[in-house]
Amino acid sequence: DPVWATLEVGGIGQDGRHMVTKTDYRFLHTLENMGPSPEPNMTVLYAPRLPENFKKYCAHISVATSSIQYENDEVMRPVWGDDYSICCCVSATQTGKEMQFFGARANLAKALLYAINGGWDLKHQEQVAPNTGRIETEYLDYDQVQEKFDLTMEWLAGLYVNTLNLIHYMHDKYYYEASQMALIDTNVRRTFATGIAGFSHVVDSLCAIRYAKVKVIRDENGYAADFQVEGDFPRYGNDDDRADTIAVWLLRTFLEKIKHYHTYRDSEPTTSILTITSNVVYGKYTGNMPDGRRAWTPLAPGANPSYGAEQSGLIASLNSVAKLPYQYALDGISNTQTINPGALGHSDRERTENLVNILDGYFSRGAHHLNVNVFGKEMLVDAMEHPEKPEYQNFTIRVSGYAVKFIDLTREQQLDVISRTCHETL
């Protein structure tokens, strides 16, 4: 199991000078001379104005090992200064001056289904959320769905925050980390982390309801059990503002609702779009969605577009994610992309140069985070079927904010990784 140790290299100082050292190169080089490793979670604090040779070396290591995540120093530095660390997966924190109350995530995809069904849970066949009145019409109306979804999110935010308040209070009571807190300044800044799961499915579902016609298929009790989409609709992940503006609205709205509630020890509420591998578990309890996602299957991870939604290539997908403002998700916006080596170029040098150009463009648009995997799906399938092969004993992949040995994942998690989009074109 991960110990969540993260190592940061690179970054730009407040005075404008880069902070790349020879030791940064040495740390990165261990991934070549000692082999890929999930931990420490190797994180490059990226900025387009970092030394060109350093950016190329990072890209070279990414292509060779798929073991690096990149985070945008240009958006984090104004918030956290130039002496910050990455905790857990992608969350920035001022080193030695603050701590974070970890908050897992809320399943907004299931919340949307609650809104449609008046709070009724199809999985457990019981009333869970407040009964706002189920939608009885044959086709879903966008304004009606959004109104009920807004009420459901308000209820969920309150339940979420108050549950976390209880957890953090009891944790401090019975398991206060005194030795760790001794290393932090006396006047501690505390942040209250929350998170979002099912993000892209909610965005695509709202797009389907707004721009196409979504017919409701009901069960024997009259609840919406499935949906039939008539017509085309924009999907998040294709650089289409019709979908991407809904994505920004969803992130901003949920954070605003979180801020309506008192947080433990007056900590500052933040949120993230980060699921690690919990997207598989959340999916087991989430029914059919209006975007076409089937019941009980994994949700798309983090801020990634839904599986199969990206139809316009890698660059368009990155542009969509880059539109999500970091200020609304200071706990992190995790984006994991898998690129076929042939899509990046026909030689190591070409792949390295193209990846640097992709990173420069992506982060110059204000994006926060990127996991880079460079391999084809056939390699994943072979590793799943033949984990005993020597070449797979240390086969490391980026998942969602952290790295893991592929053969250490459960088969269910491996199948989820395999089902994710592998970009064949830029």
Across the structure, where does each feature detected by a protein language model lie?
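Conserved catalytic cores of very large enzyme subunits
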Residues: 1-426
